[in-house]
Amino acid sequence: MDETQAYDAFRSTMNSKDSKGKNTINFENEYSISLNDKNGRDAASSILTTIREEKDAQLALAPYYYFTSSIYKGECTCSRVGLMTAKSSDTPLYLAKINGKEIYELAEKYLADSDEKFHITNKYELPIASGMKIIVRQEENGFSLKDIEVNKKKIDKEKEYSILLTETTMSVLKKINPECEIRRLGNTTLSSAWTAAMENGQQPSAPEDYIEVEK
């Protein structure tokens, strides 16, 4: 079996009809979870942007490890849709309203933060953003934040933005501003929000150009 045949077999398995699940989604486009030539992940970007728009947030920031699979063109059962996010380590969703300066500090601290659980050391561990483009510099031991753009313009440090957060990025924001008002979105998780959006019959949002790495 050559590489193309192996890929087709894998895609067929991912999209095969689950006997336990009757509902299927027909994806019109295909997005890869692998890094693209700009160091972004199209599938992760599509999923996060879909959820951000569903929750009426302007921006979103999430770790890469919540997104686990490519989106394959064609029919896909709801149970397979659930496997596109890390259900075993799912995260609640939070919404905060903070200014551009705090968003800059959030991204800056996320890139620099280091503890026994997680530290960004290579491009594969960069976060997934939506509604904004994060421009980073590659350093000897990781990455530093150079700039953030919203609608192709530098983020307005004084303007207030609504931002969708996961457990991890919410915790980083709390370190920056312990008094910040952050609202948990009920029992909604990243995985349940993604699955619910697809079960409603909509197509995933197009991936965004959300990351730029300067050497």
Positions of PLM-derived features:
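Catalytic centers of hydrolytic enzymes
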Residues: M1-K215
